[in-house]
Each structure stands twice: as C-alpha cells, then as structure tokens.
Amino acid sequence: MNFIDQLARAERLHDSLLCVGLDPEPGKFPGAWKGDAGKIFDFCAAIVDATKDLVIAFKPQIAYFAAHRAEDQLERLMAYIKRTAPDVPVILDAKRGDIGSTAEQYAREAFERYQADAVTLSPFMGFDSIEPYLRYADKGVILLCRTSNPGGNDWQMQRLADVPGQPRLFEHLAHRAQTEWNRNGQLALVVGATYPAEIARVRELAPTLPLLIPGVGAQGGDAQATVQAGLVCDASGASTGPIIVNSSRAVLYASAGDDFAQAARRVALATRDALNAASAAARR
C-alpha cells in the first residue's frame, strides 16, 4: 500500500486529520524521566499508545533523536509504531536537501534504515535533490513549500522575475509539485498553519496533493481556519487532496506529571474533534 492510500485508510479508520509530532525533549519529560535521554523511546512509545487510534499519522523529528545520540531509539520507535499501530503511516521529519549520491544515502536512511512511509525534504536544490527519493515508488515525499516560521518570508514570498506571471517562489514550487515533478503521484507539500491565505493559494495550485500543515497548537495556528483553507470541496461534498494537521508540543507536553500520556490523549482528542468540526463545516 502506498503512502497516499495509507493516509486515506487512517483518515477513514480513525476519523482524523490529526498528526502527532514526536519531538522528544528530555528536559520536559515527567517525573523521574526528566532529563534522561535514555527514556526517549519510552516517552514516545507512551504517547503513541495513548493516541494511536486518534491520528492520521505520526511524525518523529529526526534531530530530536540525533541530538541525544538516540538514533537507535528512533529505529526502535519506528518498528514499535509499525507493530502496534500498523494502520498509521509514519512521516520522518528530516527536511533533507542534497543532490547525487548524498541524496541517495539520505533516501536509504529514511526508507530502508528507518522504514518511514514518507519523509520531509527541502527542495531548494531542485528536482535532482528529490529524485532519489521518488525511486521508492510506494513512499511519500513531502516538500517544504510555505513554512510557518517568520523567516519563511525571506525566500518563499519573493517573486520570480524569469517565470511567466512572476509567481512567488512558494507558488512556483506548488505548481511544479502538482505537475511535472509528481511523476508517480508521491508528492505532498508542507504549508504552515499560521498562514491560512497561503494554504488556500497552495491548495488552488495543487488541488490533489496532500498538505502537511504544522503549526496548530503551540505555534498559534487556528484549527478552523487551517481546515477551511486546505480542504476544498466540490458541490457533491467530495474534497480535494487530503490534509494532515500536525500538533507536537501541545500534545506531548500537555502535562509534566505522571499523567502525561492521559493528558496527551485528552489534547489529541480535543484537537481531532476541532479539526473534524471544521471539516464538517467546510463540506457544507
């Protein structure tokens, strides 16, 4: 089953657009685990167990593991999710961006070492920086397009004078991803929840692509505005490409106590329900 089909299955089974990001910070762990990088797997596995029936995907961020020399714990976690939540696709948030043989090795890392179902990439170096990943025909390749950070304006909002119509960089990327780059139907785009107008513009340019939308929760994105911008429906109520709305810190650190997993579930459930309410409104 390819990544797009996995998303559709998880959305249907769990009635969810919510992706829980797994960004472990040992300094925020509860109780006796606080500050202990050796507990990264245990913490993340507890979050997975508490939320796996509420999500469309999980998204571990590789830097939060690598910084603590915990890549082995990430491997364990990926295998654990595959075993205990086999209907939930896993997005490896790596944001790699390189070319040639280096890109080939990064692709092997994501899809062979970690067995991810999809990976995030920076496409700044062009198509040959993503092509090695597209050789894995059943995997998702998710390109940074319009990111939620303020510095995204430095490049993404600049107009391209040499391209007909002088689109902004993020618009040009969305168009390319929807058309000539999407040879096997594997591509998706990252669009930050803090910019609903740009989500709507990306959806206009890339009507069938999945959109991974971070920024709901701790970064201040509004769930209703996010869903209404990204989920466009026709007269029959059928929607365009799926949306994957990520929340990380708001779920992971809902409590600093021993009830952290239960608190994470409560926040995940409330977020899922808010997204579903917005989805229902968008379909009317």
UniProtKB/Swiss-Prot annotation:
GO terms for molecular function: orotidine-5'-phosphate decarboxylase activity. It holds the Pfam family OMPdecase. The active site is at K95 (proton donor). Its EC number is 4.1.1.23. Pathway: Pyrimidine metabolism; UMP biosynthesis via de novo pathway; UMP from orotate: step 2/2. InterPro entries: Aldolase_TIM (IPR013785), OMPdecase_AS (IPR018089), OMPdecase_type-2 (IPR011995), OMPdeCOase_dom (IPR001754), RibuloseP-bd_barrel (IPR011060). The keyword Lyase applies. GO terms for biological process: 'de novo' pyrimidine nucleobase biosynthetic process; 'de novo' UMP biosynthetic process. The keyword Lyase applies. Belongs to the OMP decarboxylase family. Type 2 subfamily. This is Orotidine 5'-phosphate decarboxylase. It comes from Leptothrix cholodnii (strain ATCC 51168 / LMG 8142 / SP-6). The gene is pyrF.
